């Protein structure tokens, strides 16, 4: 029997405290998602159909992280989710949604509802701005067959010239008491749009993760050989794609990485999941811009039990990160996170960012079903290897595409997690724990954290001592749950 080495996970280790001159509030938590994309905080919401669609992705990006839209939907639906994130907020909207004057009120309302916007510019066939239609114009309009040109606020409108900065726009908003500011060229053609909502969001979420156009960043999951999905996502403006598989160290994944990077060399591509240095080396050499680590650590994943395969997560992160570092490729730790301390341990072990599923599945923004059980609220949460998820489309992730439904071999379960409110509150607690850890170690940023970190291996008695013991909890803390 060939036993290579002893492997450890989060509960097997603790970080040693060090001399510190750094307070938790002073630490910097920006990091790399990929070789080319920076995050303002190191958390990513998982590409799972009970965790991340546009609502979760929007909030994660506003908080400085990122959401990965799952692929358990057709291409058109996934593209729509990406567009909802990209159009949810902008500095200057360079491709604003618009309508023509002959469109009906019903058509305009449908567009506004789809993109969750409160108004649209109205342009003629030459793209000249001839009016704007807002909720104010529609408030008392009952005839939905009426034409937009009969209801809209007609030109002349308050506008701004090309090159208008957000600071200039704020002055115009303040002076004219308007909510939308169209950007026009010298001929009066629509070139962009700035909204008061986006300026408010800019102040409310100063650490938002945005692209060069001021739009929120978003990633989306793809499968092996799904070039048509990649094409559509690139057209929609996706910032990164995540090649999602249970076994990233396989020919199909490596070939897909090469194909995508050959066609779209400037598209950031994250590949996984892996758990060994050899896998990290193969994906980095194939062209991956980040690698995702985790074979079976997730709370709803049964891969290690069903297949007998996997590597405990701390050891997997350490091994993959040391290899990926040779190529300048960041590592994403995916799975097994139960507490904020696990995030700190994963980063200290070499990960650049952390993908989270179960801790976000119970939030307002997750797409899972909200229900009540024994007087307490829960949301549904399932693994992408569960029977339900595989039947809906994720079977290719486990190399079972084309398998009839009653012959599927699941590698995950379906369950429930407690309802926890907004993502904003959950992330606040998780980042608070990370900042505290960095303060204990004396690290000013994540790179310094990794350089300073020293681990000790603990016994089962040490783990028991680490948790609450010899007392009955009467009031639960927001960052420590008894049933975890």
What is each stretch, according to the model?
Residues 1-21, 99, 161, 286, ...:
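Alpha/beta catalytic cores of nucleotide-metabolism and tRNA/nucleoside-modifying enzymes
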Residues 23-40, 46-48, 77-115, 122-124, ...:
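Bateman/CBS regulatory modules and CBS-like beta-alpha motifs in cytosolic regions of diverse proteins
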Residues 25, 74-83, 141-145, 165, ...:
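Active-site-adjacent beta->alpha loops and helix N-cap segments on the catalytic face
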Residues 38-45, 91-96, 211-221, 260-275, ...:
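Short beta-strand/loop segments at the ligand-binding rim of alpha/beta enzyme cores
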Residues 55-58, 228-236, 275-293, 333, ...:
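Catalytic cores of alpha/beta
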Residues 62-77, 238-250, 289-307, 337-370:
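Glycine-rich phosphate-binding active-site loops on the catalytic face of alpha/beta enzymes
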Residues 69-74, 117, 121, 128-144, ...:
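Short beta->alpha transition motifs characteristic of CBS
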Residues 69-72, 98-99, 119-121, 159-161, ...:
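Catalytic beta/alpha-barrel core
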